[in-house]
């Protein structure tokens, strides 16, 4: 199979730019003979999620794979400076969004279907000044494990992937912030990240996408409830 990877930019810019980015991706995929549609969806809103699932079913008549990848990761500040609104904003997208999408999708998915939650190394390890993000990703692992048990009788598998730093738009924004805290330029900071990874480099979007493709495939038909590290050996538990 062919692996398609596209970074649609930050969720924070969805109303401004990601719609155009999505349309561009759809156009490119159609040119490669993929049957694809783009659907704008606020994953933190029950009605929006339900409408998105309806649109998928209306077009395709079935839903086999769900990848919960919507996230906010650029609210980075010390815990005492966090507002409740900032906390809820991150949790509503990163965790509640995955819950709502999984719940609505499970109602129409059949035997052999698969849900993959894109968690993070932050689902297993704490990072300073990232309390909402880390909490949301830890919660995603709990959601993955519980959903896997609840949906197993329906033949639906649920797994998560846990990448470390990845060179997406969000990853670059995080690099810029943490490099500034250390008085480094972003490239030097990313080089330091690569040095602590046993395989010697920073993660690429394709690394995560390949893991997701495996978990969605029939080759992973007896795997559910897992949180797979995609970190070049940096995270091992």
Q: What kind of feature is each model-predicted range?
A:
Residues 152, 157, 223-225:
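Short, small/polar-rich loop/turn modules that mediate ligand/substrate recognition or access, typified
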Residues 79-80, 112, 125-131, 153-154, ...:
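Active-site loop immediately N-terminal to the catalytic Tyr-X3-Lys motif
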Residues 120:
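Residue(s) in the substrate-gating loop at a strand-loop-helix junction
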């Amino acid at each position: 199979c062919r692996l398609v990877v596209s970074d649609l930019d930050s969720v924070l810019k969805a109303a401004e730019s990601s719609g155009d980015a999505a349309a561009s991706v759809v156009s490119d995929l159609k040119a490669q003979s993929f049957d694809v549609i783009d659907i704008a969806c606020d994953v933190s809103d029950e009605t929006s999620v339900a409408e998105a699932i309806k649109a998928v079913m209306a077009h395709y008549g079935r839903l086999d794979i769900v990848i919960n990848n919507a996230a906010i990761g650029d609210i980075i500040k010390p815990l005492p400076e966090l507002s409740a609104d900032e906390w809820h904003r991150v949790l509503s997208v990163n965790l509640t969004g995955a819950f709502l999408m999984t719940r609505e999708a499970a109602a129409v998915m059949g035997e052999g279907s698969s849900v993959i939650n894109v968690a993070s190394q932050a689902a297993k390890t704490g990072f300073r000044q990232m309390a909402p993000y880390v909490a949301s990703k830890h919660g995603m692992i709990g959601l993955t494990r519980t959903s896997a048990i609840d949906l197993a009788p329906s033949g639906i598998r649920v797994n998560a992937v846990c990448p470390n730093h990845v060179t997406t738009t969000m990853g670059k924004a995080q690099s810029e912030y943490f490099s500034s805290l250390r008085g480094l330029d972003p490239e030097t900071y990313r080089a330091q990240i690569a040095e602590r990874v046993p395989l010697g480099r920073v993660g690429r979007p394709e690394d995560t996408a390949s893991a997701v493709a495996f978990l969605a495939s029939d080759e992973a038909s007896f795997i559910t409830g897992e949180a797979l590290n995609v970190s070049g050996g940096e995270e091992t538990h």
